[in-house]
Swiss-Prot record:
Stretch list, region Disordered: 1-52
Protein name: Ubiquitin C-terminal hydrolase 12
Organism: Arabidopsis thaliana (Mouse-ear cress)
Gene from which this protein is expressed: UBP12
Reaction(s) the record says it catalyses: Thiol-dependent hydrolysis of ester, thioester, amide, peptide and isopeptide bonds formed by the C-terminal Gly of ubiquitin (a 76-residue protein attached to proteins as an intracellular targeting signal)
Biased composition (Polar residues): 36-46
Domain USP: 199-524
PANTHER family referenced in this protein's UniProt entry, alphabetically: UBIQUITIN C-TERMINAL HYDROLASE 12, UBIQUITIN CARBOXYL-TERMINAL HYDROLASE
Listed InterPro entries: MATH/TRAF_dom, Papain-like_cys_pep_sf, Peptidase_C19, Peptidase_C19_UCH, TRAF-like, USP7_ICP0-binding_dom, USP_C, USP_CS
Length: 1116
């Protein structure tokens, strides 16, 4: 993901990343640029005579699907005295999503340096169910450079244009903007440390969720002290050690003057850049991080700290009403998940948590020795921890919409929380009543935005004083109690009205999308222990030394950077550098300037004084030095261009640098010419216009080696033949040795190296200062085979050579072999070389797959036979080039395979338990019937006349029975499992009063949610009218071969939309199920609840969860 220049105000992240509209082609919007204003109606609700600083604007856009302009603007509306409008791209701003921005309508005519800050939300209204309205919220400091801001990927166009979704009704779209204009913030000059005594954490891309959690943990001093006391050594690397990385982070938060980076910590988690750009679940991160620390604290002086701070216990109980039977189970917790929906406040959530559930009627409890009994089921707390972490369930699964939704309801939480209230109603009989469970609020973690992303920050009272602080990434501010508590309750807020009598409409209310999702309370009786003093003596000596050294180095760099404008960097290349580098590090041009000696000289220093520095460094007297300025030519080569004049050498170095390169950050690059005679320097001869400085490279075709030979000053009127003797002498050839000369002209984008006529003058050959001439002995002995017989072919090879790492596709992490190839190799050349390496007779049986540089995985689609022209096309991925290719060895030639479709089919035998996977390969135009016929030739059937069917299975559920006429080219077996099975006789003979139902295995997740998880193999079952569950159970037990002992533990439920309704043996199952042709019937099934004893196997990523549901993992 690429993010444009970040805004000056703290930037919330969203999954699509907030960006300004970078529509450079169309240029900035003009003040009056309104597209078809007469076709779009706009209304402003509650706009009194004087505009309030907060306002809601509604824009009705008719004929939406017929909009043929790329950009579309709303009417102008005024908020806080400023003019605004909404800008949309109906077909997306170069993406397959609707793009939508808030725009300053008169930006082009505003005075220089204008700026304004607004918090705003943009929405596309769902006109069928308003609760499904898509709304996104952000804030931005608008200025001339960024006069619009919003969301390039607001919502998928496929959803927007689908009339059944409710966003486009009668070809009309409703867009809403809620804008609050705030005081302009001077972001850049704000000093968090100076203003508050605390510093923030830098955001790596989408890590504000982690920053808010880390600040909360850091401000629990007992926790911080324990982290400091975890044993680490000076040999540990912070990027590989979580304890050391966390110690380092906490130390910097305590002693730095500016915000702190978290990259070391995320690297110690084993995260790559991609992980840092993923918005993870904060609650999950908290649990995983604490589990890791708990594990790493074992066997150390701080073992048990995590449990001491955060661990509490509750008792799950089931108590029979009519018989003397009670079952209890003690469980520990590190945090509690509290319901928000339907609860007024924290106390209401605790009431709900301990609410007694009655098990009666169809849901009786099976008590050992007593059979089915009416019972009470509930939870009571044995003890609470000193630090109580409450996770508020702001995100819930909406079964009707099949998606996650955010609960923005008002939910209150007190400054002081008394969990002993009403005579200890939350406590179990075993609880220690001498412990006073009175808690004080320490932290409020806030989420601003919607379910698909947003921004996280925290309000914290570090010492439990009356002063609150807001920790929002890099920025820390002082806040009052109202901001930390009441404003984070969520719910709705009324827009202010300056003239309540202006009309009789009720005040407009808008939903607040910023609200608390996690609360941290500290027990009053443990306050002094937890809010303890933490100072330098708690920090290991090696850590203090390391971090102070880091700080000093950082300060040196900062000082160096701050003084950079006073200095000029001069890089001096010499003959010795050319000799060292040509033929080893470089082949084209003359030198890599990053590897030559550089001097940092004050800009005002006279050049003559700099020459004295050079004399000291290289031992070359000042009078023997001559310096040449380098220049970039039009063909992108970089050569010495001209010597400095005596007048220039009287100037300061800064002036010379500026004359040679106007860029402020540019360096002054020079070539030092020193003349040698008997190894002693002599003054360089005076240079006239007739003199040309040339550089020479020697090529040895037998060894394929290029080296630097030296340089000569030649007359432009002379000819190459005049200097062949000197060149031979230079490299130790016989004086009359025949040599060929070539001019190295350029190497980008392709090599140009041309033969030089020895009898034509340098002037006529257009040879000038800084040109490079390569020479070699001609190949006389034709028996000697040379891959690159002449300079041009060798330079062509060097420019295009590419080392490629080949990996077997089934082992995508392991390099198997490396081949040196040419970027110009054709598809056929590449597969021939690979086949030769593998000892394969037929190269057409190889299939190659390119590498995805971002995911570090093979691309999903292989390279088609002769589908690319050259190796260079195989290695490129967007703007990056890889050096990895994956290969497969096929059993038939690739061109033949490309005309076929291969399906992976799992065959389930009617009587055998073993499932066998078959690869069925058929022409693409084949049908499912052809697949079944092919499969019949490969499998053993229970009887010769058995009929087969093909099913689509996903997440242990059956989604489709394929009709035999369906063509296979559109069937996807990458994400779905294709299952073939015999059709049972009873299904073939199904009667008019029978029903075919789905039967799935399931288990409930442990914990408060108790979400249903399917597992195992789903199947069909015929049920008959009037048949009871008991009769069906007998058939299921027989079908699945389950022992009586195990089967007695199974429960049976009618499942609809993911919710179980438990059945009794006497229930008639038939009545529960709708006909198969009724909408929604596919979501109804008979659920078999029992323990999952199937062997676990690693699913592919796409079988496990979607990319955006990536779990939090700390690998180290």
């Amino acid at each position: 993901m690429t993010m444009m220049t970040p805004p000056p105000v703290d930037q919330p992240e969203d999954e699509e990343m907030l960006v300004p509209n970078s529509d450079l082609v169309d240029g900035p919007a003009q003040p009056m640029e309104v597209t078809q204003p007469e076709t779009a109606a706009s209304t402003v609700e509650n706009q009194p005579a004087e505009d309030p600083p907060t306002l809601k604007f509604t824009w009705t856009i008719p004929n939406f699907s017929r909009q043929n302009t790329r950009k579309h603007y709303s009417d102008v509306f005024v908020v806080g005295g400023y003019k605004w409008r909404i800008l949309i791209f109906p077909k997306g701003n170069n993406v397959d999503h609707l793009s939508m921005y808030l725009d300053v309508s008169d930006a082009a005519s505003l005075p220089y340096g204008w700026s304004r800050y607004a918090q705003f939300s943009l929405a596309v209204v769902n006109q069928i169910h308003t609760r499904y309205t898509v709304r996104k919220e952000t804030q931005h400091q608008f200025n001339a450079r960024e006069s619009d801001w919003g969301f390039t990927s607001f919502m998928p166009l496929s959803e927007l244009y689908d009339p059944s979704r409710g966003y486009l009704v009668n070809d009309t779209v409703l867009v809403e903007a809620e804008v609050a204009v705030r005081k302009v913030l001077d972001y850049w000059s704000y000093d968090s440390k100076k203003e508050t005594g605390f510093v923030g954490l830098k955001n790596q891309g989408a890590t504000c969720y982690m920053n808010s959690l880390l600040q909360t943990l850091y401000h629990i001093p007992y926790f911080r002290k324990a982290v400091y006391h975890m044993p680490t050594t000076e040999n540990d690397a912070p990027t590989a050690s979580i304890p050391l990385a966390l110690q380092s982070l906490f130390y910097k938060l305590q002693y730095n003057d500016t915000s702190v980076a978290t990259k070391e910590l995320t690297k110690s988690f084993g995260w790559d850049t991609y992980d840092s750009f993923m918005q993870h679940d904060v609650q999950e991160l908290n649990r995983v991080l604490c589990e890791k620390l708990e594990d790493k604290m074992k066997g150390t002086v701080v073992e048990g700290t995590i449990q001491q701070l955060f661990e509490g216990h509750h008792m799950n109980y089931i108590e029979c009403i009519n018989v003397d039977f009670k079952s209890t189970r003690k469980e520990s917790f590190y945090d509690l998940q509290l319901d928000v929906k339907g609860c007024k406040d924290v106390y209401a959530s605790f009431d709900k948590y301990v609410e007694v559930e009655r098990l009666e009627g169809d849901n009786k409890y099976h008590a050992e020795g007593h059979g089915l009994q009416d019972a009470k089921k509930g939870v009571l707390f044995i003890d609470f921890p000193p630090v109580l972490q409450l996770q508020l369930k702001r995100f819930e699964y909406d079964f009707m919409r099949d998606t996650m939704v955010k609960i923005n309801d008002r939910y209150e939480f007190p400054l002081e929380l008394d969990l002993d209230r009403e005579d200890g109603k939350y406590l179990s009989p075993d609880a220690d009543r001498s412990v006073r469970n009175l808690y004080t609020l320490h932290s409020v973690l806030v989420h601003s935005g919607g379910v698909h992303g947003g921004h996280y920050y925290a309000f914290i009272r570090p010492t439990l004083s009356d002063q609150w602080y807001k920790f929002d990434d890099e920025r820390v501010t002082k806040e009052d109690l109202k901001r930390a508590l009441e404003e984070q309750y969520g719910g709705e807020e009324e827009l202010p009205q300056t003239n309540p009598g202006f009309n009789n409409n009720p005040p407009f209310k808008f939903t607040k999308y910023s609200n608390a999702y996690m609360l941290v309370y500290i027990r009053e009786s443990d306050k002094d222990k937890i809010i303890c003093n933490v100072d330098e003596k708690d920090i290991a000596e090696h850590l203090r030394v390391r971090l102070k050294k880091e700080q000093e180095e950082k300060e040196d760099k900062r000082r160096y950077k701050a003084q950079a404008h006073l200095y000029t960097i001069i890089k001096v290349a010499r003959d010795e550098d050319l000799k060292e580098q040509i033929g080893k590090d470089i082949y084209f041009d003359l030198v890599d300037h990053d590897k030559v000696r550089s001097f940092r000289i004050q800009k005002q220093t006279p050049f003559q004084q700099f020459k004295e520095e050079v004399a000291k460094e290289f031992g070359v007297p000042v009078q023997l030095q001559r310096f040449w300025i380098w220049a970039k030519r039009q063909n992108h080569t970089y050569r010495p261009n001209r010597p400095l004049t005596p007048q220039e050498e009287l100037q300061p170095v800064g002036q010379i640098r500026e004359a040679s390169n106007k860029a402020n950050t540019a360096e002054l690059k020079l070539f030092l010419e020193v003349e040698h005679l008997d190894l002693r320097p002599i003054p360089p001869p005076e240079k006239s216009k007739e003199d040309i400085l040339l550089f020479f490279k020697l090529y040895d075709p037998e060894k394929a080696v290029l080296s630097y030979a030296g340089r000569l000053m030649v007359k432009s009127s002379s000819k190459p033949m005049d200097i062949t003797g000197k060149l031979n002498e230079m490299v130790g050839f016989a004086p009359d040795e025949e040599i060929e000369l070539f001019e190295e002209i350029k190497f980008e984008p392709c090599v140009m190296c041309e033969h030089l006529d020895k009898k034509t003058s340098f002037r006529l050959c257009q040879i000038e200062d800084g040109d490079i001439i390569c020479f070699q002995k001609p190949l006389v002995n034709k028996e000697i085979e040379c891959l690159y017989p002449a300079v041009p072919s060798f330079l062509e090879y060097v420019q295009n050579r590419q080392l490629v790492r080949f990996r077997a596709l089934e082992k995508p992490k392991e390099d198997e072999f490396v081949l040196e190839l040419s970027k110009q190799h054709t598809y056929d050349d590449v597969v021939e070389k690979v086949a030769e390496k593998l000892g394969l007779d037929d190269p057409s049986k190889l299939r190659l797959t390119s590498h995805n540089c971002y995911s570090q995985q093979p691309k999903p689609q292989p390279i088609k036979y002769r589908g690319v022209d050259h190796l260079s096309d195989m290695l490129v991925h967007y703007n990056q080039t890889s050096d990895i290719l994956y290969y497969e060895v096929l059993d038939i030639p690739l061109p033949e395979l490309q005309g076929l479709k291969t399906l992976k089919v799992a065959f389930h035998h009617a009587t055998k338990e073993e499932v066998v996977i078959h690869n069925i390969r058929l022409p693409k135009q084949s049908t499912v019937g052809d697949v079944i016929n092919e499969l019949k030739t490969k499998v053993e059937l229970s009887h010769p006349d058995a009929e087969l069917r093909l099913l689509e299975v996903f997440y242990h559920k059956i989604y489709k029975i394929f009709p035999s006429t369906e063509r296979i080219e559109n069937i996807n077996d990458q994400y779905w499992t294709l299952r073939a099975e015999e059709i049972p006789e009873e299904e073939k003979n199904i009667g008019p009063n029978d029903r075919l139902i789905l039967v799935y295995h399931f288990a409930k997740e442990t914990g408060q949610n108790q979400q249903v998880q399917n597992f195992g193999e789903p199947f069909f079952l015929v049920i008959h009218e009037g048949e009871t569950l008991e009769e069906i159970k007998n058939r299921i037990q027989k079908k699945l071969h389950v022992s009586d002992e195990d089967f007695a533990k199974w429960k049976f439920a009618f499942m609809s939309m993911g919710r179980p309704e438990y059945l009794q043996d006497t229930d008639v199952v038939y009545n529960r199920f709708q006909r198969r042709d009724v909408y929604g019937a596919f979501e109804q099934y008979l659920g078999l609840e029992h323990a999952d004893t199937t062997p676990k196997r690693a699913y592919a990523a796409n079988q496990n969860r979607h990319a955006y549901e990536k779990p939090v993992k700390i690998y180290n």
